C-alpha cells in the first residue's frame, strides 16, 4: 500500500509529509520512504495556533475555523509530496494525520478530565484528496487510561530493535521524548516518555531576542556562556522530577512559560540566555536518563532525531553530559531525522487498518492495548 504520513508538532516549524510504501503489519511490517517534504506554515497560521493554545487568547470560533484551515493545509502537504515524487494521488491507499495539538491534559486535575485535542479536520483532507484518512490517534489511549503520548515507540520498536544493543531514541521537536528499546526485547519491554522541553524554548528565545525562526546549527548558543544560577532555576521545574509515564507540551513550556522566563532573566546577556536554555534541554535529557533510565537499562547508543538533531551546540552539550553513551543522529544511523514522526504515523495508520493494537502501555500508562485512530472513508466511495 501507498500512504502519506502527516505530522505538525509543537515546534510549529512546518508540516512534515512523507510518502511511503508499506506492507505487512506488526513485526512483519516493511516500510520504504519514497519522498519527504516540510510545508511551511505561514506566520498568520502560526499565530492562530499559538492563540488557540493560550486560555486567555483562545476562543471557540477561532478553534472551529482553524480546524478546517489546517485541514486544507494538510491536504496541500499531501498534494505537494505526491507532486514532488511524481506520484499520482489517486494511487494513495490512505493518509495518516496526527493533526495539530491544541491542548493536552495527560492527567485529570480540578474539574478537568484527562483529555487531548488535535485539530486539522480529517473530512477536509479526505474530500480534498479523495483518500481514506486515519487520524485522532491519541484519544483511544487516553480513553484506556493512558496519557495519549508518546505514540512513536511502537514504530521505533519495529524499525530499530537490535539483538546486540540497548538503544535509546531521543526525539527533539518542540518537546523532547525518549524511547528505550532494550536488546532482544519484545514490545512490552519498551518504555518511553517526554523528557521536557526540546526546541520550543530555544526557538522562542531566538525569535524574541534574535529575530530568527530558530538557532541554525546552534550558532547563537555557541557564542554564549551558561548562566548557572538560571540553569539551576530552570532545572527545578516539577515536571523533570515527575516519574514516568509522563507527557507534556505547549500548555506547560509554551508562550506563558517563555514570557515569565524572559521577564525574570531580562538582565542576562542574550547569548548567555540562549546558551542556557539550550543546556536546559540537554540537561533535562540527562536528568531523565540518570534518574529514570539508567536504573533499568545501560544504554549503549543514543540516537537523536527531530529538528534538534541539526543544533550542533545542543548535540555537543548532550555528548558532554553522556560521556559513557555513544551519541549519534538518526541520519548517521541511516534513518531520516526529519521524517521520523511522519513515518511513524504511516505505521500506526497501517496498524489501525489491520485492526491491530499499537499503543505501548509501558510508555503511555494505559490499562489496555488498544487499536488507535479514527477512520474517515473516501468521500466518493471506492477502496
UniProtKB/Swiss-Prot annotation:
GO BP annotation list: 1,6-anhydro-N-acetyl-beta-muramic acid catabolic process; amino sugar metabolic process; peptidoglycan turnover
Pfam families: AnmK
Pathway it works in: Amino-sugar metabolism; 1,6-anhydro-N-acetylmuramate degradation; Cell wall biogenesis; peptidoglycan recycling
GO terms of molecular function: ATP binding; kinase activity; phosphotransferase activity, alcohol group as acceptor
Keyword set, alphabetical order: ATP-binding, Carbohydrate metabolism, Kinase, Nucleotide-binding, Transferase
Domain of life: Bacteria
The enzyme's E.C. designation: 2.7.1.170
Record field: catalytic activity: 1,6-anhydro-N-acetyl-beta-muramate + ATP + H2O = N-acetyl-D-muramate 6-phosphate + ADP + H(+)
Binding-site positions, ATP: 9-16
Biological role: Catalyzes the specific phosphorylation of 1,6-anhydro-N-acetylmuramic acid (anhMurNAc) with the simultaneous cleavage of the 1,6-anhydro ring, generating MurNAc-6-P. Is required for the utilization of anhMurNAc either imported from the medium or derived from its own cell wall murein, and thus plays a role in cell wall recycling.
Family: Belongs to the anhydro-N-acetylmuramic acid kinase family.
Protein name: Anhydro-N-acetylmuramic acid kinase
Organism: Clostridioides difficile (strain 630)
